[in-house]
Amino acid sequence: LHVRSRRQRQMCIRDSSHGAQVIFPDDPQFEGMPKNADDRRFMAMPAYLGGKYQMAGMKWYGSNCENKASGLPRSILMMMLNDKDTGAPLALMSANLVSCYRTGAIPGVGAKYLARKDSETVTIIGPGVMGRTCLLAFLSVCPKITTVKVKGRGQRSLHAFEEFVKKECPQIQQVIVCDSMEEAVKDSDIICVTSTAPVKEIDFPYIAEDWVKKGALICLPSAARFDDDFLINRCKKVVDNYKLYEAWAEEFPYPSYEMVQIIGSKFTDYLHEGRIQREDIVDIADIINKKHPGRESDDEIIVYSVGGMPVEDIAWGGTCLLYTSD
């Protein structure tokens, strides 16, 4: 996890960008040009990470929801790792699992510092690979979890998720497949949305405040929609790295959320509107370093934004390379 260190660099003036994105128009004017669609993009995510890693590199991926019809994953990712001094290539590796495990790990860090210690039920909205790695991370830091609720779009992915839980998660005693968001969210201690986001904010998965259990942690590596009054006035807003959202706000000027599709950009939209103050958005690093309190009561609802940083990919990719070399 990035914990406020100068020993890292990412693309952009603030050294905290998610990366450089290629997207396509809604109405292409040239033959053969792709058309805008849900999660259709290319992304380059370069970074340098110091400390014990001393590694430069880049994750590159293409994403298209239509891949599923061809039996391919939505995103297909590669990672290049380079010597930080010479630039010589050290490894070119598939990065699908690297990316999924690093994405799952960050909600796990959030649960470690923000979830109630007596959490027993977790909800996964989107039973794909990212939902699985998030669940594994939650189980590693919340040993009292015994029930997982899951909502998905198709029976095939739901069945695969159930089989995964039976095989890999022995502490889970019950898997509940839910037909609605309300059923999935109610009575859960941890709610995690990992589903593919639609293009328009109005179509993002909706979570009503009165469905959310007091004291719940809502982890959002993907998009969700809430009532403004709840987000502004009745939840703690935590982000994985505030500067990441500042960089997004520069790249995608207000309103940013519909384009970025990570809830931290909704927070910066509120900041732009003057509806919240900067101090209302808390960096997880400040909680880890004890500069800011984490959970302040058993009834506090916390919304945790997970944007994803290239330095995390370099850290985990570099670790995998180290184990391979050994």
Q: What feature does the model see in each segment?
A:
Residues 1-9, 13, 323-326:
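Single conserved hydrophobic/aromatic residue that forms the stacking wall/gate
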Residues 14-78, 84-90:
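N-terminal entrance/gating region of PLP-dependent enzymes' catalytic architecture
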Residues 93-112:
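A glycine-rich, Thr/Ser-enriched phosphate-binding loop motif common to dinucleotide/cofactor-binding enzymes
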Residues 107, 119-139, 152-153:
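Glycine-rich adenosine-cofactor-binding loop
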Residues 143-165:
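NAD(P)-binding Rossmann-fold cofactor-contacting core
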Residues 173-188, 205-207:
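Short acidic low-complexity segments
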Residues 199-214:
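Rossmann-fold NAD(P) dinucleotide-binding segment
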Residues 224, 229-325:
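Adenosine-phosphate binding glycine-rich loop
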